[in-house]
């Protein structure tokens, strides 16, 4: 190690010049990194639900669905101005990018038809197309026709007639949320009239809102950087103590994001919080190196800056590299989850951590070697050392007193068991109705609640009926099974309503029987069902029944609406569908789960549920292996596990208590945080080992470690906790606020564990990889006692 550190500092000018050129080049590309949401990144591609969705979404509807509700303040929607607004929305949506022209459905579309039987035959005509009724008599007739139309009433016109719904599907492969959302907002603004409210919800709207808040996000980032600078300045009072941690974080960021751009990887807007999670590592390691440098200078005033930097690098290279390696290992585990968003997050994290080896662990000591230590200028006249010293003395007092140390370990064990018990209640998926990205009182979530109150639900899932031959969807057994399934699933409180090909056939069959409601059912003859479908589709346009069947009547879909997409809601509905399919098999067809937004979310939740415990176990295994190798002792692998377990169980328990679900948005933070803060313990442990091998007893070694490395732990934790808490107070996005709160909690628990629990464990258990064997330890204590005499 001495040879390596001397080599680094001997060629420091070449090294810094090379790093500078690389930073300029990669920084140029980092500035061009694409920040956008790609919905397919959220989908586990190999999951059967996602494969079903991808196979049938072009016909049956994908995940990018927007619902627009027109609600009147007075009277009902059957007023000329309101009907004009609905028609304007229907026409205006056709000009929005990536729209599926055949899947715009409203009262003003051709797809909602009124079927009538007269002495001259059957007539099927649109309820309100191509024109709208102008006279009061025509409007009254439309009201009556709508109320008697089972496809329109309740689904596209509310039961109280005070609201109308317009739904539209977007083509997944063409949609650009950055363009679509402003176009939707502009359309709403153009058709909005006094006396009515227009509500807008759906995945494209939600993604657009997140993108719209990017300027606010960048403003918060600037505020956080300023907060970090202030805290570092208060902690150290010097230019180098303030700027070097941020400089190392910035350079490593430029390297990582530059390479990410060159690889063609995008950065999701919600992943901005993750960048602070990773940046915390650079700040932490840089602060430890600066404090080690200052400590060497304080002990030996004649020591040159170059020698002090060399010693600091030599002493901290192992714990620093071990900390980065364990973090990288935890992120490598995340990459095993078959969700592109997590794989990209893991790639960014791994690249960033790899860059820190050079940009932090090596660069910071090199830059410190040029410091004019004899002419150090303090910007602030006062120091926070007395505060830090008081905290560290208290920690040392707890850890070096056997009774207190035992109490600390018992309390930590109790908290571990208790938080682990509470953590089991964490919700997989969304824990609350509405979008967890936004606050409950946000306009979007209020609109979503309003739509779900008046209509079957804004979130959709389709269940595929896959036939084994053409025209199977005309088979009476298949149609009867579909009808019975609809009755069964609509009885589930999670499902707001369903629609299928059977809903097209039933009203025509009733009309054939002079309107007798006894015949509101499918026919029991395949040819008769074919005739009923022919009558229903007479005069229809291409795509009118695409939501329910393909043109060969081989594969169909049962469309289901959900009033929320909570994890429990989705799991209960999926299980109910599986139970029905198992008990009601079909000879000529089968049910295939599941498409639409709910189907994709169900797939994500199942992947998270099956993989989260596995990810944590693998991350702990990696921590064990790395520690065992670094300290050449399996005991070391076990010793540091309590810190990681404690921080994780407390964080997950907090999520369960606070109603934060483990979903596709929170999982990257939760997964990347598995190994967060363990480097704190490495620095403490290495300093104990260093002092003990230098001849001190165990209590003095613990005191020394806390006074040196403990100061860095406090500064780093304080810096990151205060800064990320700004997300909570400044962000309009609930997700960012809650993730900031989670990171703050994670850092706090890790810091407390490293400062109190780990030293207490060292004092009680005297691990041999730090203090040698019990015989050596006894001999050491005897020597110290003899010398004291």
Language-model features and meaning:
Residues 18, 84, 88-157, 170, ...:
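Alpha-helical transmembrane helix bundles of large polytopic membrane transport and channel proteins
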Residues 212, 216-265, 336-340, 614-659, ...:
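Interfacial segments of transmembrane alpha-helices in multi-pass membrane proteins
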Residues 231, 321-364, 368, 624-627, ...:
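Hydrophobic, glycine/alanine-rich multi-pass transmembrane helices and their short helix-loop junctions
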Residues 399, 404-527:
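Juxtamembrane segments of multi-pass membrane proteins
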Residues 277-298, 320, 326-327, 362-363, ...:
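Short helical (or helix-break) motifs at transmembrane helix termini and adjacent helical loops
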Residues 1-37, 366, 380-432, 446, ...:
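Signature of alpha-helical transmembrane segments and their immediate interfacial
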Residues 296-325, 691-718:
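Helix-loop junctions and hydrophobic alpha-helical segments within the transmembrane domains
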Residues 58, 84, 129-239, 480-483, ...:
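Extracytoplasmic
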């Amino acid at each position: 190690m001495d040879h390596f550190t001397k080599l680094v500092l001997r060629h420091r000018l070449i090294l810094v010049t090379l790093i500078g050129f690389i930073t300029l080049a990669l920084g140029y590309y980092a500035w061009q990194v694409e920040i956008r949401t790609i919905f397919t990144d959220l989908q586990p591609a190999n999951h059967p639900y996602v494969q079903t969705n991808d196979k049938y979404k072009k016909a049956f509807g994908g995940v990018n669905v927007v619902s627009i509700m027109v609600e009147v303040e007075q009277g009902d929607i059957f007023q000329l101005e309101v009907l004009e607004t609905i028609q304007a929305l229907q026409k205006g949506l056709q000009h929005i990018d990536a729209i599926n022209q055949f899947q715009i459905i409203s009262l003003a579309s051709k797809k909602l038809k009124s079927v009538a039987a007269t002495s001259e035959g059957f007539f099927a005509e649109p309820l309100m197309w191509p024109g709208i009724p102008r006279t009061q008599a025509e409007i009254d007739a439309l009201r009556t026709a709508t109320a008697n139309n089972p496809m329109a009433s309740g689904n596209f016109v509310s039961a109280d007639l005070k609201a109308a719904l317009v739904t539209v599907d977007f083509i997944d492969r063409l949609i650009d949320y950055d363009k679509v959302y402003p176009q939707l907002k502009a359309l709403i603004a153009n058709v909005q009239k006094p006396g009515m409210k227009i509500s807008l919800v759906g995945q494209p709207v939600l993604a657009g809102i997140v993108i719209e808040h990017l300027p606010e996000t960048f403003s918060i980032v600037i505020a956080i950087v300023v907060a970090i600078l202030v805290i570092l300045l208060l902690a150290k009072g010097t230019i180098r103590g303030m700027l070097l941690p941020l400089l190392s974080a910035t350079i490593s960021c430029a390297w990582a994001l530059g390479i990410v751009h060159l690889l063609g990887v995008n950065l999701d807007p919600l992943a901005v919080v993750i960048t602070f999670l990773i940046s915390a590592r650079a700040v932490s390691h840089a602060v430890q190196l600066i404090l080690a440098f200052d400590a060497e200078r304080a002990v030996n005033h004649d020591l040159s800056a170059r020698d002090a930097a060399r010693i600091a690098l030599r002493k901290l290279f192992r714990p620093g590299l071990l900390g980065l390696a364990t973090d990288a290992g935890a992120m490598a585990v995340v990459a095993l989850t078959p969700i592109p968003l997590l794989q990209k997050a893991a790639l960014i994290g791994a690249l960033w951590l790899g860059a820190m080896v050079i940009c932090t662990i090596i660069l910071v000591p090199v830059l410190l070697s040029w410091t004019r230590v004899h002419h150090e200028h303090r910007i602030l006249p006062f120091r926070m050392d007395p505060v830090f010293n008081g905290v560290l003395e208290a920690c040392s007092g707890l850890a070096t007193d056997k009774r207190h140390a035992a109490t600390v370990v018992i309390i930590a064990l109790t908290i571990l068991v208790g938080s682990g018990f509470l953590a089991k209640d964490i919700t997989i998926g969304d824990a609350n109705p509405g979008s967890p990205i936004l606050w409950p009182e946000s306009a979007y979530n209020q609109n979503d609640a309003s739509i779900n109150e008046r209509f079957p639900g804004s979130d959709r899932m389709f269940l595929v009926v896959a036939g084994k031959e053409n025209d199977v969807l005309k088979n009476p057994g298949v149609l009867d099974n579909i009808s019975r399934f609809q009755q069964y699933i609509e009885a589930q409180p999670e499902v707001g309503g369903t629609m299928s090909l059977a809903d097209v056939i039933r009203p025509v069959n009733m009309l054939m029987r002079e309107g007798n409601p006894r015949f509101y059912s499918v026919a029991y003859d395949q040819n008769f069902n074919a005739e009923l479908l022919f009558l229903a589709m007479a005069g229809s346009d291409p795509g009118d029944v695409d939501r329910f069947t393909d043109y060969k009547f081989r594969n169909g879909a049962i469309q289901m609406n959900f009033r929320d997409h909570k994890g429990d809601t989705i799991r209960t509905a999926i299980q109910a569908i599986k139970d029905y399919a198992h008990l009601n098999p079909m000879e000529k067809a089968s049910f295939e789960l599941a498409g639409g937004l709910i189907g994709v979310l169900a797939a994500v939740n199942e992947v998270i549920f099956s993989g989260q415990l596995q990810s944590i176990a693998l991350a702990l295994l990696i921590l064990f292996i790395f520690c065992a190798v670094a300290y050449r002792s399996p005991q070391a692998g076990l010793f540091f596990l309590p810190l990681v377990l404690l921080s994780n169980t407390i964080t997950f328990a907090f999520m369960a208590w606070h109603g934060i679900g483990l979903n596709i948005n929170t999982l990257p933070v939760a997964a990347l945080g598995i190994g967060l803060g363990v480097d704190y313990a490495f620095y403490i442990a290495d300093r104990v080992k260093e002092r003990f091998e230098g001849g001190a007893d165990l209590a003095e070694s613990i005191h020394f470690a806390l006074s040196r490395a403990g100061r860095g732990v406090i500064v780093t934790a304080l810096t990151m906790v205060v800064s990320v808490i700004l997300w909570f107070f400044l962000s309009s996005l609930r997700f960012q606020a809650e993730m900031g709160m989670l990171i703050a909690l994670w850092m706090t628990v890790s810091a407390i564990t490293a400062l109190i629990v780990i030293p207490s464990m060292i004092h009680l258990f005297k691990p041999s990889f730090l203090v040698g064997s019990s015989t050596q330890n006894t001999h050491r204590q005897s020597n110290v006692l003899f010398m004291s005499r």
